[in-house]
Amino acid sequence: MSQSPAAHVPVLYTQVLDGLQVTENGTYLDGTFGRGGHARGVLEHLGPGGRLLVMDKDPEAIAVAEHSFGGDARVSIHRGSFAGLGQVVAAATVDGILLDLGVSSPQLDVAGRGFSFGKDGPLDMRMDPDSGQSAAEWLAQASDREIADVLWTYGEERQSRRIARAIVARRAEQPLLRTAQLADLIASVMPRGDSKTHPATRSFQAIRIHINRELADLEAGLDAALGALKPGGRLAVISFHSLEDRIVKQFMARYAKAPPSNRRLPEAQPFVATLQLVSGAIKADDAELHVNPRARSAVLRVAEKLGLGNGESGMGKGNSAAASRFPTADSPFPASANGDAA
């Protein structure tokens, strides 16, 4: 393995566990296992009757999961995207779900995965290298308009058209097969500026999101997670850029708050909340950033599924006990969600 599980530093570790409020006999799902940092924390709080389901579409992550937890009867391992978690668990059976979005540190750190503009490697970018087109294959056949649309939509890259034209012109001379080729090409056509950010940052992000269908998977995964949670179950989502966080924030708000039109106009069926917001946006503190600078852009949001139609939390005594056991005095999460978090 490129990086040992022990060396992996999960972001917002304490905040995630506080947000999930793990109970000894609960059932939990980690939809983005990665190197298992958060999963280990969940397992530490599970008793013999608890259950943890882990998912990842990266075969290297699945290999780590099997090596680390293959002998633990409480753990079930599934290779695939969290967008399909509804095929892994039945409806209303899970006490907590974690989605840690985006590319993992091991994927970025290994040049051979093709995610990093700072390390030369094959231009791949697939989280599942056995599925779909690689970045090189897509860039070899996409039109300049298609490329520009992706760079703008998923990277908010202002120079998207200029970069797209440069890619199409260069591939007519030689194929773009390496990350360094693409990064250098993008840098060569970008206006000079004082930004400390590498000029290829937004383009690499955009291409990666497109290749892996990340935002479509996120929308499907959030819907599936809501269906899989029990009343009182909690959904914790870590995002790393504004596009992801916007989707998560809007999803949680859609099921937690009546839209403005419902407050002004009579409705045949009044709005009934399905989720309760447990927290606003939670970010890493200075101490964590000192140890793990990659946590700087991480944003955690947590919501709790409500009981059917009563507008109240479905948390039972087991979850209340967990609240007194696991959260610390300075935890950003209340023991139960009886009002919208600030």
UniProtKB/Swiss-Prot annotation:
InterPro entries: RsmH, SAM-dep_MeTrfase_MraW_recog, SAM-dependent_MTases_sf
Enzyme Commission (EC) number: 2.1.1.199
Cellular localisation: Cytoplasm
Cellular-component GO terms for this entry: cytoplasm
GO biological process entries: rRNA base methylation
Entry-linked Pfam families: Methyltransf_5
SUPFAM superfamilies: Putative methyltransferase TM0872, insert domain (SSF81799), S-adenosyl-L-methionine-dependent methyltransferases (SSF53335)
Catalytic activity field: cytidine(1402) in 16S rRNA + S-adenosyl-L-methionine = N(4)-methylcytidine(1402) in 16S rRNA + S-adenosyl-L-homocysteine + H(+)
Disulfide bridges in this chain: none
Region (Disordered) residue spans: 311-342
Top-rank taxon: Bacteria
Keyword Cell cycle set for record: no
MF-aspect GO terms: rRNA (cytosine-N4-)-methyltransferase activity
Keywords: Cytoplasm, Methyltransferase, rRNA processing, S-adenosyl-L-methionine, Transferase
Residue numbers binding S-adenosyl-L-methionine: G36, G37, H38, D56, F82, D100, Q107
HAMAP family: 16SrRNA_methyltr_H (MF_01007)
Family: Belongs to the methyltransferase superfamily. RsmH family.
Function: Specifically methylates the N4 position of cytidine in position 1402 (C1402) of 16S rRNA.
Protein name according to UniProt: Ribosomal RNA small subunit methyltransferase H
Gene: rsmH
